[in-house]
Curated annotation (Swiss-Prot):
GO terms for biological process: ether lipid metabolic process; lens fiber cell differentiation; lipid catabolic process; membrane disassembly; N-acylphosphatidylethanolamine metabolic process; organelle disassembly; peroxisome organization; phosphatidylethanolamine acyl-chain remodeling. Optimum pH is 9. The gene is PLAAT3. Pfam families: LRAT. Belongs to the H-rev107 family. Residues 1-133 are cytoplasmic. It comes from Homo sapiens (Human). This is Phospholipase A and acyltransferase 3. Its main location: membrane. Residues 13-129 form the LRAT domain. It is linked to Lipodystrophy, familial partial, 9: An autosomal recessive form of partial lipodystrophy, a disorder characterized by abnormal subcutaneous fat distribution. FPLD9 patients are lean and show muscular hypertrophy, insulin-resistant diabetes with hyperinsulinemia, hypertriglyceridemia with low high-density lipoprotein (HDL) cholesterol, liver steatosis, and polycystic ovary syndrome with hirsutism. Some patients have more generalized lipoatrophy, whereas others have abnormal fat accumulation in the face and neck regions and show cushingoid or acromegalic facial features. It is found in: Cell membrane; Cytoplasm; Cytoplasm, Cytosol; Cytoplasm, Perinuclear region.
Length: 162
């Protein structure tokens, strides 16, 4: 039997499992979250929308967690509590509530929803999704370079034998 999802507490980070990425929000109580909503997170835009990669603005929204998650699974994930001390809960919520309704800068690689919630909870803007993609791309690039080098060496060796 699967363990039940723990009830979020104010100030908790909520990780929402979209089909191709993770969306992040911060729980502020009474069923509500505050999150950064680029066009891909606007109702009807489609969960797999690439619109967030094409925009530089997002709206800070306060919505019911149930509505933001929709049919996607979610979990409480305060994953950096071991590295950073969370700010006091009252400060997290105050900062989040003050931003609701504001249009803010949005960059997929440096100012996305994960950066936003980590800044609110820890005072440190970071995104592991971005880091993981950069690492994967670097590893893939090195692999392709190594394969190309092996191919060149193999073809030279083959020509020398002829």
């Amino acid at each position: 039997m699967r363990a039940p999802i723990p009830e979020p507490k104010p100030g908790d980070l909520i990780e929402i499992f979209r089909p191709f990425y993770r969306h992040w929000a911060i729980y502020v109580g009474d069923g509500y979250v505050v999150h950064l909503a680029p066009p891909s997170e606007v109702a009807g835009a489609g969960a797999a929308s690439v619109m967030s990669a094409l925009t530089d603005k997002a709206i800070v929204k306060k919505e019911l967690l149930y509505d933001v998650a929709g049919s996607d699974k979610y979990q409480v994930n305060n994953k950096h509590d071991d590295k950073y001390s969370p700010l006091p809960c009252s400060k997290i919520i105050q900062r989040a509530e003050e931003l609701v309704g504001q249009e803010v800068l949005y960059k997929l690689t440096s100012e996305n929803c994960e950066h936003f919630v980590n800044e609110l909870r820890y005072g440190v803007a970071r995104s592991d999704q971005v880091r993981d993609v950069i690492i994967a791309a670097s590893v893939a690039g090195m692999g392709l370079a190594a394969m190309s080098l092996i191919g060149v060496m193999f073809s030279r060796n083959k020509r020398q034998k002829q």
